[in-house]
From Swiss-Prot:
One of its GO terms (biological process) is protein import into mitochondrial matrix. This is Mitochondrial DnaJ homolog 2. One of its GO terms (molecular function) is ATPase activator activity. Present with 573 molecules/cell in log phase SD medium. Keywords: Chaperone, Membrane, Mitochondrion, Mitochondrion inner membrane, Protein transport, Stress response, Translocation, Transport. It comes from Saccharomyces cerevisiae (strain ATCC 204508 / S288c).
Amino acid sequence: MVLPIIIGLGVTMVALSVKSGLNAWTVYKTLSPLTIAKLNNIRIENPTAGYRDALKFKSSLIDEELKNRLNQYQGGFAPRMTEPEALLILDISAREINHLDEKLLKKKHRKAMVRNHPDRGGSPYMAAKINEAKEVLERSVLLRKR
């Protein structure tokens, strides 16, 4: 009489363990290396320092001033938006990341859309990127849910 209850509890515990493990795995797959470092309290000084030379503009046919400006330009958007890129687009500073909640995200998104809305002369592409940045951060583990 007690054996079916014990078996039922065992099966339930195994099922809950598998479910929580799968949920943790799906969250882990969406994390960027920079976010993983932050969650583990690992300080990264300059994550792109190793790639700076690869991005240098090396043409000898242009003047030095223009070459310096091109070397400082980091490029356009990544093919798939990352959390750091979304934070830059929505102008969320390092201090604000610790307090990032739905209210702050909505405020920053609204401010960016007011500045870049297509009805006010902004680019539709930029407006789409702002919306994409908001969606990325809504799915992010950086966002504090209430």
